[in-house]
């Protein structure tokens, strides 16, 4: 197994993906860290580092400040694991870390990295309420 450690945060990458594709979950939560079996290799990421997760095609993209990771796992699985860590499903394709929301206005959420996420009209009140409760 090749290991690569990036000390600029708590991201650890190990390029052994021997357990991928065996039907087991590709995500594990240990305290406040996610252990992911990604396309890029096995990755350990602090939940607080994740800005948002988006579904694109059959994979999810875990967006951090300076890095993205691709993983074949249901967004529902991420939602169940991260709900207690301040994550909110704002759209069928987006799970957002509420600590990284800059503002919500006119059905658009702006995140710390400048990304704008549309909030469906049906979910807007709930999203605004959840965000207000966090503040």
Regions found by a protein language model. Give the residues of each.
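Membrane-interface aromatic/basic loop that binds lipid-linked glycans or pyrophosphate carriers
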Residues: 4
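Conserved binding/recognition cores within well-folded domains
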Residues: 7-112, 116
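DNA major-groove recognition helices of helix-turn-helix
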Residues: 78, 126-127
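C-terminal output/interaction extensions
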Residues: 127-135
């Amino acid at each position: 197994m090749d290991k690569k450690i990036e000390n600029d945060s708590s991201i650890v990458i190990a390029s052994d993906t021997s357990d991928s594709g065996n039907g087991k979950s590709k995500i594990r939560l240990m305290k406040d860290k996610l252990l992911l079996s990604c396309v890029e290799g096995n990755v350990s990421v602090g939940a607080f580092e994740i800005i948002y997760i988006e579904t694109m095609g059959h994979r999810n993209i875990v967006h951090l400040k300076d890095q993205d990771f691709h993983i074949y796992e249901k967004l529902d699985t991420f939602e169940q694991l991260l709900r207690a860590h301040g994550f909110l499903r704002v759209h069928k394709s987006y799970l957002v870390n509420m600590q990284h929301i800059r503002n919500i206005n006119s059905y658009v959420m702006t995140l710390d990295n400048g990304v704008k996420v549309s909030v469906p009209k049906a979910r807007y009140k709930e999203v605004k309420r959840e965000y207000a409760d966090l503040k």
